Amino acid sequence: MCGIFGSTNIKTFRELYTKNSERGNFVRSITMLFPGGMKNDIRVSTKYEQDFDKTIEENPFCIYYLGHVQSPTSGVRDFHIETSHPFNLKNKYIAHNGVLSNHEELIQEYNLDIKSKVDSDVILPLIEKIGFNDAISTLQGTFGCWYYDANHAELRIFRSGSTLFSNGGDFSSIQVSDEYKDITEGSVLIYNFTNNTFNKEICVSQ
């Protein structure tokens, strides 16, 4: 079991982390998104940590904080970055909560180049191969994901089977309050960095 969560506000993000940490205490990742045009032009930065008591530091330039807490996978019990979330490929990033049931079939069917034995590692190569909508509709099993395309500065969240809630601007695998509403299965919410809300929805058939 794992958990995903995100917020623009560091205080809220820390609270979401505390709530979600019960879903995974093996390794955590903190991913920060930055605007374009900065001197070093770094758009995404991720820290992987196993010290769950360490304070999550604020970065004044971060425009969105994304998190993932992970339990050991069924096949991997040691910490390795290549088997930890988020996975990344060609400036695209994804963190996944759940278990895919058809990842081995997808690897064979689409001749995907997978670097690890973790089921989540199939998602980005599949998106690269057949496109986002077709890839998501092809997945079977359970998943709640955040996905960021740094090439287009586009943040998306979606789920099928796994829990995922949002209050409009923040999201979490755990419903931390009544303000957080269940995200409809088969819907993909797209974040608007201007008004700081997930206010665009597309439907993907399952």
Task: Name these PLM-found stretches.
Residues 1-206:
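N-terminal segments that mediate ammonia production and transfer
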